Amino acid sequence: MMISEKPLGEESIRQDLEVLTVSRRLVKSVSQKLKKKIHKTEVVEDEEVARGAVNCLSISVGCRVADTGEDFEEDLSNKRWSSASEDGKGLMTICGTEEIRLDCFSYGVRERFWKKNNRRYLADSGQDYRKHVYLPDDILEMCLMRLPLTSLLNAHLVCKKWQSMANTQRFLQMRREGSFQTPWLFLFAALKDGCSSGDIHGYDVSQDKWHRIETDLLKGRFMYSVTSIHEEIYIVGGRSMDRNSFKSHRGILVFSPSIKAWRKIASMRHARSLPIVGATEVTSEFSTMQTKQNRQDRRFHLSRVGGESDVYEDPHRLSVRRQNRNSADQNGTKSHRLIRQKLDRLNRNSSKRFVLIAIGGTGIFDEPLDSGEIYDSATNTWSEMQRLPMGFGVVSCGIICNGIFYAYSENDKLSGYDIERGFWITIQTSPIPPRVHEFYPKLVSCNHRLFMLSVSWCDEGDGQIGRRNKAVRKLWELDLVYLTWTEVSVHPDAPMDWNATYVSDQNILMGVEMFKIFGQVLSFFTVCDILTEEASWRHVSRNQRNQKLNLSCMNKTIALLHL
């Protein structure tokens, strides 16, 4: 007996509906919302496909579209490629509902249809494009090269790539040769609350603005000297407090302001406080060992004048003396050969070779030193140099000018050390510039000319008190041919600072004076152009570094760099 499937199906549906507890009104509302959503989706898809068809015809007129669906191979023999102008023969409907794949002969046209009509894709692609925008390395390097120092230091914080690019030797060399650097004046050894603060104060001459550089390496260190060369500042010697005693230093610290980096080089052989220092470039043939050998040879010949020959001395010790002399000569020749090989290897790897000279100062027992040391950057070693001439006295100041290290003593004597040949020359000058001995004189080299600033009593008196009624600071120049001093100009300010410091930049003299009066520290920054006829001084900056400093005139020292 056959049973109808339809009644059984209706009966099962009715039973299922009876089991359900959901209300009919809820089911009806859900079904209506679902129908509206499906209808809206179909309308949007039809509009997008229609716009795509219009754009295809408008952009690529005559675009050939073929059906590459599943039935493509079966109808390949019957269907042929045709143009859009042949009443649509062989063309499939683009805006229809059939799901077929369309290939366009114009490369990328299909993607262009979809991208142009999809605003979200355009917005996302624009954001991705902006994310990947970058400058080539050569253009970025040229832009960084032209930044001032403060902006360049801020650029180091952008990313590691910018930091590494701005710290290379090639970048620094191109920045130096491109004349994009400006002069900076750095003030060291400023005191705060009676002790060394360790901070460095940098003055941007072009922007007339001071900057403070914090460092812990110089905190508590004082009575050191500084000199600058190759965009680096060298801090030489000094003292520090070690519990209940003072400690003298032999170490040398090197500060690179352009990258805010510190490093150390070889220490001196003797600890020195307040040494007279200087730095200058030398040729690749320069050798401290050669100059030392020349000095030893001269002393050997001088010591033999009026002496006895080896032949007339003890004959039994003649062979021993000859053997010791031959072994010493062989060892000296061998060591000299090894040093020359090391120099040649280092000269090929290094860019510019320079020497650092430190003379005088005080030792570990506060005794004045008449010795000196010279540092060779190629070998990173210090060597003893010839002592100061007999009776020269305590060195008060010094400067390097035209390859000669000039030193001036408290006894008003002048000597010069020939760096290439390695010996001192006593210089007799006349007349000696008058000075007040409570104020130290300062030697300055400016534009290959040698100057000295000293404080003396004014020559013009009122007849009542006499000539010692007013002290002035005068600028003197030494004629390097006739060895005579000539007065150049008079500083306009009263010499209140007994330790005023001066540096030079081409034809410009720069001076910093700091002194305490009525409980307040005053600071003055003055400059003088020596090429002008009057060589007059003018004030550049006043009272900008005196907020938290005191008694800074005791130990301050300055250095000038182009950064």
Curated annotation (Swiss-Prot):
Transmembrane segments: none annotated. Residues 129-175 form the F-box domain. Keywords: Kelch repeat, Repeat. This is F-box/kelch-repeat protein At5g42360. It comes from the Eukaryota. Kelch repeats lie at residues 184-231, 232-282, 355-402. InterPro entries: F-box-like_dom_sf, F-box_dom, Kelch-typ_b-propeller, Kelch_1. Gene3D superfamilies: 1.20.1280.50, Kelch-type beta propeller. SUPFAM superfamilies: F-box domain, Kelch motif.
